[in-house]
């Protein structure tokens, strides 16, 4: 019998994880009463996938943008859900698409995207580190501390587009295709604009390490058009959607009647910050209250590993640059990691200081650095050469991480099925 490749094993494990998780959620939703009846506003017998933000996603995908608070969500995933719903309608030979078609279609796409994202993460990690590191990263990725990969949420497809963009950029050197993937990610989540940093830095620095550049090279950057065009491609979907919201909520008729929304008088009239602040209480330090301490505690394992991983990476980056300048040997990290860790720092800062911090548990799915940090901190000898599996040992932090993701993942499934907080 032929030995299965690591990629095949990961594919099988990812598919089994989706089947198992969907089965568990289905059973739990039948056994648990809904703590909040919001899902019943859309369907009298809501499926387990219809919880929290999925309620908004399904509503907009089916009815379009009806209310101001809904423009907090980028339109990309909602369009995918609608298209998937049309596919379900076609398969069941119905004349009109129904809300349940949209929910089922979105659930299928999200689960397929999660499996695909896991495979792309393995291939990306294998090229940057080594096969053992990549295998462990993928296995940890299949133990997320959230139930959202099984639901019609933005994270799975956002992760797939982001990982694919990084892979196409750093491994295949396909800048245009990478830019399209990153732009697609921005249509899914507004944080996709951070990927413009990765693309622009790669266009400027290429395979050079940032500390190896001569000061004259920085002066040349201002004369280059390509990096800025790349960045515009990635951020364009965000501003295009803001223009759309302006045309809907800031019409001349509404302005004449003095009934236009307050943000319409801003220059430029951007709705995003206003809506996030008014309806979702998102803003600098808005979440820093005593009552939210439990939610900070939930995100602490990721925040702690992020801090430790960032300090370790940039310390290595600086020290490797210094020894190279002195002629001694120390292998510096691959150049692409500087961009990815920089984006990681921005993302974690946004989650810690501005957002609902507990969403770190699901936003982490789209950030490969989170999972690389977990492997670096949780396993010994994993970055040495090819790192044969027999030489790699799980340490105390690794056991804690695995235990935490398993236990909290199970708790999160129960909370999700019963529509219990936190979201």
UniProtKB/Swiss-Prot annotation:
Its main location: endoplasmic reticulum. One of its GO terms (molecular function) is alpha-1,6-mannosyltransferase activity. It is a multi-pass membrane protein. Keywords: Endoplasmic reticulum, Glycosyltransferase, GPI-anchor biosynthesis, Membrane, Transferase, Transmembrane, Transmembrane helix. The keyword Endoplasmic reticulum applies. Pathway: Glycolipid biosynthesis; glycosylphosphatidylinositol-anchor biosynthesis. It is found in: Endoplasmic reticulum membrane. InterPro entries: PIG-V/Gpi18. It comes from the Eukaryota. Coiled coil: none annotated. GO terms for cellular component: endoplasmic reticulum membrane; mannosyltransferase complex. GO terms for biological process: GPI anchor biosynthetic process. Its EC number is 2.4.1.-. The chain crosses the membrane at residues 7-27, 102-122, 128-148, 151-171, 191-211, 228-248, 298-318, 333-353, 400-420. Mannosyltransferase involved in glycosylphosphatidylinositol-anchor biosynthesis. Transfers the second mannose to the glycosylphosphatidylinositol during GPI precursor assembly. Belongs to the PIGV family. This is GPI mannosyltransferase 2. It comes from Cryptococcus neoformans var. neoformans serotype D (strain B-3501A). The gene is GPI18.
